């Protein structure tokens, strides 16, 4: 029977999120107390995919007490991350297995979103269950993983808090030097982050993909929703404001709209096949179109992206505690014989949930948790926005006032914009 210390390998995959170092520290410190050896794989699966043991060793670090003892306060990740995807081929998966075996990794902890977890499970499926156990800690500032009891993903609270501060400053700026800011917020498929930042800061409008009734969104509809809101505020003497746009709007756009955003070419994708939403320049495209329509009214519009500056912020207290618990939960799950599982927190308890239980049978991928547009939370956020509602269009005096601000007749205004109440959920 081997007396060698079990080896725990840790890697981060996907984009950074506040709290990554907290998970690394939480897991490492507990494992070291158990007498395990802990190593960190630099840049996710990038070097493991090469299958070259010497290359992997050169990009692997021993995680010791001195290295991790105080890193839970820090943003970023000390072992770096990447979007390398071993699921691209069976050869890449076998390369990863080869390297894990060579380094005698018994426990494999991945920290990332659904792509990272899927990659880890696919690797483990080609190995004996007694040879390696795989656990993942779910991470994304998008908050779109289907965790139980509406538990947020780690990093979301920190990202929302910092995003709120940025938008709050833009709110003051927009009034001080009158203009509209169109703020594009990260969120690949869901609008949790955009809506959270907008509601917390009191932004005048927020548009998320979940509120559109049709399966596909048209660029023209998004333009007109913002345009009508700008005119409504202008009717009240306010030639300034802030509109927050979830970049996930792009994911739901029609092929016609996508070609417009990407300059009549196929949208580029990342190694996991996701559209590179940042390349769509949604806020800039909307700003350019709105200036054509509203420039004669003296409206100034400035596009702004909020995303990368949120990903490596130092975690707020909630995420610092949360991630430490997830790190502990991962090691506890290994000790209790779990594998192919995600570590989640439910009702104050950290526990493993089988990865397969979170999969969408239709796609084979982890289900996306969308914003519940029927919830009270969404209704509260909506009621404080300046968008034109069905009730507004029934108010003839208001319609006349807003139409006049746009130098239009009430009839022309209604014909152009009233249909939008059927485009989005009221």
Curated annotation (Swiss-Prot):
It is an enzyme of class 2 (transferase). Its cofactor is Mg(2+). Mg(2+) binds at residue 114. The record marks 115 as: Important for catalytic activity and substrate specificity. It is found in: Cytoplasm. GO terms for cellular component: cytoplasm. The record marks 139 as: Important for catalytic activity. Substrate binds at residues 140-142, 186-188, 247, 308-311. One of its GO terms (molecular function) is 6-phosphofructokinase activity. Pathway: Carbohydrate degradation; glycolysis; D-glyceraldehyde 3-phosphate and glycerone phosphate from D-glucose: step 3/4. GO terms for biological process: fructose 6-phosphate metabolic process; response to glucose. Gene3D superfamilies: 3.40.50.450, Phosphofructokinase domain (3.40.50.460). Diphosphate binds at residue 15. Non-allosteric. Pfam families: PFK (PF00365). It catalyses: beta-D-fructose 6-phosphate + diphosphate = beta-D-fructose 1,6-bisphosphate + phosphate + H(+). The active site is at residue 142. It comes from the Eukaryota. Keywords: Cytoplasm, Glycolysis, Kinase, Magnesium, Metal-binding, Transferase. Catalyzes the phosphorylation of D-fructose 6-phosphate, the first committing step of glycolysis. Uses inorganic phosphate (PPi) as phosphoryl donor instead of ATP like common ATP-dependent phosphofructokinases (ATP-PFKs), which renders the reaction reversible, and can thus function both in glycolysis and gluconeogenesis. Consistently, PPi-PFK can replace the enzymes of both the forward (ATP-PFK) and reverse (fructose-bisphosphatase (FBPase)) reactions. Homotetramer. Belongs to the phosphofructokinase type A (PFKA) family. PPi-dependent PFK group II subfamily. Clade 'Short' sub-subfamily. This is Pyrophosphate--fructose 6-phosphate 1-phosphotransferase 2. It comes from Trichomonas vaginalis (strain ATCC PRA-98 / G3). The gene is pfk2.
């Amino acid at each position: 029977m081997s007396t060698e210390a079990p080896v725990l390998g840790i890697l981060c995959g996907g984009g950074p999120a506040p709290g990554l170092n907290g998970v690394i520290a939480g897991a490492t410190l507990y494992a070291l107390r158990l007498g395990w050896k802990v190593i960190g794989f630099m840049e996710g699966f990038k070097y493991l995919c090469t299958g070259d043991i010497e290359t992997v060793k050169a990009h692997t670090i021993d995680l010791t007490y001195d290295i991790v003892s105080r890193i839970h306060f820090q943003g970023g990740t000390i072992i770096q991350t990447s979007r390398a995807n071993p699921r691209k081929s069976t050869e890449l998966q076998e390369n990863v297995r080869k390297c894990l075996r060579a380094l005698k990794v018994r426990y494999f902890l991945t920290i990332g979103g659904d792509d990272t977890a899927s990659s880890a499970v696919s690797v483990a499926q080609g190995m004996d269950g007694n040879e390696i156990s795989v656990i993942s800690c779910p991470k994304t500032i998008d908050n779109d993983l289907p965790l139980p009891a509406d538990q947020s993903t780690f990093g979301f609270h920190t990202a929302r808090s910092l995003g709120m501060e940025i938008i709050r400053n833009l709110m003051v700026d927009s009034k001080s030097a009158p203009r509209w800011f169109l703020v594009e917020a990260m969120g690949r498929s869901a609008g949790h982050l955009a809506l959270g930042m907008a509601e917390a800061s009191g932004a005048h409008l927020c548009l998320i993909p979940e509120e559109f009734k049709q399966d596909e969104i048209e660029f023209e509809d998004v333009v007109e929703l913002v345009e009508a809101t700008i005119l409504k505020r202008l009717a009240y003497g306010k030639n300034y404001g802030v509109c927050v746009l979830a970049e996930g709007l792009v994911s739901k756009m029609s092929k016609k709209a996508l070609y417009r955003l990407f300059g009549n070419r196929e949208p580029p994708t990342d190694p996991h096949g996701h559209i590179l939403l940042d390349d769509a320049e949604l806020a800039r495209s909307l700003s350019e179109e709105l200036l054509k329509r509203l420039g004669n009214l003296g409206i100034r519009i400035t596009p702004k992206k909020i995303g990368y500056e949120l990903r490596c912020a130092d975690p707020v207290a909630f995420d610092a505690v949360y991630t430490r618990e997830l790190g502990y939960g991962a090691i506890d799950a290994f000790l209790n014989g779990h594998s192919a599982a995600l570590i989640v927190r439910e009702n104050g308890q950290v526990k493993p949930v089988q990865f397969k239980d979170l999969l969408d049978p239709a796609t084979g991928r982890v289900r996306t948790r969308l914003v519940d547009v029927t919830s009270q939370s969404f209704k509260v956020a909506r009621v404080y926005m300046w968008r034109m509602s069905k009730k507004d269009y029934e108010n003839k005096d208001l319609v006349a006032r807003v139409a006049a601000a746009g130098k239009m007749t009430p009839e022309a205004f209604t014909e152009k914009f009233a249909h939008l109440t059927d485009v989005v959920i009221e």
